[in-house]
A protein has these predicted regions:
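Catalytic domains of carbohydrate-active enzymes, especially glycoside hydrolases
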Residues: 1-11, 233-236, 277-279, 286
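Extracellular glycoside hydrolase catalytic/binding regions
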Residues: 79-82, 86-89, 93-94, 104-283
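Aromatic-rich peripheral "rim/lid" segments of glycoside hydrolase catalytic domains that contact
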Residues: 256-345
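N-terminal targeting leaders for non-cytosolic proteins
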Residues: 346-400
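Short beta-strands within extracellular/lumenal beta-sheet-rich domains
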Residues: 391-413, 463-480, 491
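Extracellular beta-strand ligand-recognition surfaces/modules
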Residues: 410-433, 470-471, 486-490
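Exposed low-complexity, polar/acidic, P/S/T/G-rich flexible segments that act as propeptides
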Residues: 434-448, 501-504
Length: 504
């Protein structure tokens, strides 16, 4: 026994030919069908949808509740679903169609706009009618529809959601299901920082037994909050013979927060996942985990898609046991082995970018980072996008213990081509955790010294420690008062807690 359903998110975007009656690229539909067939070959249920077309922030996004030309949107939406439904009309009940993904106007603060919500309801009705009209097994296929942003409260509450009618269903009954997503509390489940890393009863135990700081625990959205929302779903839909699918849920990997307690943090993650899955199952709802394929820091991944190996076996087994036994607290005693990966050498590197993109990127950058020919060269763009070596020299730091270290770049007149920086930072090749403490940061521009009282120290996208000093793209970062130097930049900092990183 294990997972029995795969949700396949499908975006169409520029694969729709607007000039040719909204024809979908046949090669793309072939690929969608190929993936569906993979699932069928394993006896799995499959959910396919129109996924990324409804985001205001996505290039080529067109399926917008707040779009100006709603007639065009409805016409295009109907045409696309007609083609999808016709392609899969002979597939049996293992294939489920989902009308859309997290459809909203891109505003995440405040209640839904009722005019836009009415557009969403209209889309759902077009979806149902269009699929049914394509005939064959689509006349009685199970169909899945969401409310505003697939949000539980905005679907069950008095915000405007209306179930579409299913009068054309040949099964003699409505075959409609409701889709919601659950990622509460978001600061625990999805915010990419290492501050909120504990949740619920499991988190309380870690505070009491292991001495975790109380500030690391989510301050809202505990078990009782979840219970209340799921009860509303059960009362409104399940008890009225309308099935509910939790189409996405999950929380990201924050196990690097404390190097010596990664197992406990992952155990709490397993408990949250198991609680959602177990509570859903106990109320007659189906949970579908969101695995985005990423298994690093802040990833949702549970297995490696290249090796097919489970990367989070404890989380997987907790979810399975929670659903099997309809037990939300199946993961309360979950133990995950602490994985303390220490290194024999740790290094720090200055990173810089001027307003005309004379730069050295982070050491973890895939294109210009530590393992490339560009990393030890301060480079600028010349004519025809040619990379020019400025001749500047870098001094990096090898960190062997707690102490004070300096990284620098010198030998180039920065003021000759720029009046300001876009970015100034220190990148490293060792994992960030909350045991590490950075202080006494001083930026030096030639002879000008600038003390940084509250440096922004965090994990980069690879999970390594990163000190951000200047970033014009981060409006929350305090401005640095400096003059562009004629010869050198340096950053000096003191670091403690390196025994959590360095092997003895």
């Amino acid at each position: 026994a294990g997972f029995t359903t795969v949700r396949v998110p499908v975006s169409y975007l520029d694969r729709i030919d607007d000039a040719n009656n909204y024809t979908v690229d046949s090669a793309w539909l072939d690929r969608v069908e190929e993936v569906v067939q993979y699932c069928y070959n394993e006896g799995l249920y499959v959910i396919i949808n129109i996924h990324g077309d409804g985001y205001n922030t996505v290039e080529d996004g067109w399926f917008l509740v707040n779009g100006e030309d709603q007639d065009m949107i409805c016409e295009k939406y109907e045409a696309v679903w007609k083609q999808i439904a016709e392609r899969f009309a002979d597939y049996d009940e293992h294939l489920i169609f989902e009308s859309m993904n997290e459809e909203c106007d891109g505003t995440y603060n405040g209640d839904p706009n009722r005019e836009y919500y009415a557009n969403l309801n209209k889309y759902n009705q077009i979806f149902v009618d269009t699929v049914r009209d394509t005939g064959k097994k689509n006349t009685h296929r199970w169909l899945l529809v969401p409310g505003w942003n697939t949000n539980v409260e905005y679907t069950v509450g008095d915000y405007g959601f209306e179930m579409p009618t299913d009068e054309k269903c040949s099964a003699g009954e409505s075959r409609m299901m409701v889709s919601v997503h659950y990622y509460d509390p978001w600061d625990y489940c999805g915010t990419e920082d290492l501050k909120t890393i504990l949740w619920g009863e499991y988190g309380d135990n870690l505070i009491e037994v292991n001495g975790f700081p109380k500030m690391n625990k989510a301050k809202w959205g505990d078990e009782s909050y979840l219970d209340d929302l799921f009860t509303k779903m059960q009362d409104k839909f399940v008890k009225n013979d309308i099935p509910v699918i939790i189409g996405e849920y999950g929380c990201i990997d924050k196990s690097s927060a404390y190097a010596d307690f990664s197992g406990q943090i992952q155990g709490n993650r397993a408990y949250w996942d198991g609680y959602v899955a177990g509570k859903a199952a106990s109320m007659g709802m189906i949970p579908v985990y969101w695995d985005n394929g990423f298994n690093g820091v802040y990833g949702f991944g549970l297995f490696d898609r290249n090796t097919y190996e489970q990367t989070q076996p404890e989380i997987i087994s907790t979810i399975i046991e929670a659903v099997k036994n309809k037990d939300p607290k199946a993961g309360l005693d979950t133990v995950v082995e602490t994985k303390t990966e220490k290194t024999t050498e740790a290094h720090a590197y200055i990173g810089i970018q001027t307003e005309i993109y004379t730069f050295r990127n982070s050491c973890s950058d895939g294109k210009y980072g530590k393992d490339t020919d560009y990393f030890n060269t301060l480079i600028k763009w010349g004519d025809d996008d040619q990379i020019i070596d400025t001749g500047a020299k870098f001094t990096d730091a090898t960190i062997t213990e707690d102490g004070t270290y300096t990284v620098s770049v010198d030998g180039y007149d920065f003021s000759s081509d720029s009046s300001k920086l876009n970015m100034l930072f220190v990148s490293t090749d060792f994992a960030f955790n909350n045991t590490l403490k950075v202080s006494d940061v001083v930026v030096k521009c030639d002879d000008q010294e600038i003390a940084i009282d509250n440096p922004l120290v965090m994990a980069d996208d690879q999970g390594n420690m990163y000190i951000e000093l200047v970033n014009i793209y981060n409006t929350d970062l305090a401005a640095l008062n400096y003059t562009m130097p004629k010869d050198s930049f340096s950053v000096t900092f003191t670091i403690k807690g390196m025994d959590s990183v360095l092997a003895a």
